Amino acid sequence: MKVFIILGALNAMMAVGTGAFGAHGLEGKLSDKYMSIWEKATTYQMYHGLGLLVIGLISGTTSINVNWAGWLLFFGIVFFSGSLYFLALTQVRILGAITPIGGVLFIIGWLVLVIATLKFAG
């Protein structure tokens, strides 16, 4: 599905940008703890952006329905990485409760991809 290729590419692009911003723009402005949180958000955004690219490519060439997996990964990025970026910049922990929701969405998204692939292969 074209939307997942676009979302994947945009998220990978944003991960490169946020990584560069963290390394150059935030250096010395955030404590090591919050820099580590920023880097984790960037890393997970990149991994799952690449996952979205793969889902977009798979959905365009087979009959596997991976749309649910794609949307779960996308919203996982929003909740997980988004809340970590916010936490790193503001040190406001209230949105920290949202981070695990994003992690669960990632896990379910990958599981849905496995199940869809097994159904197709089976």
From Swiss-Prot:
Keywords: Cell membrane, Membrane, Transmembrane, Transmembrane helix. Its main location: membrane. InterPro entries: DUF423. Signal peptide: none annotated. It comes from the Bacteria. The chain crosses the membrane at residues 3-23, 46-66, 69-89, 98-118. GO terms for cellular component: plasma membrane. It is found in: Cell membrane. The keyword Transmembrane applies. It is a multi-pass membrane protein. Pfam families: DUF423. Belongs to the UPF0382 family. This is UPF0382 membrane protein SERP0230. It comes from Staphylococcus epidermidis (strain ATCC 35984 / DSM 28319 / BCRC 17069 / CCUG 31568 / BM 3577 / RP62A).
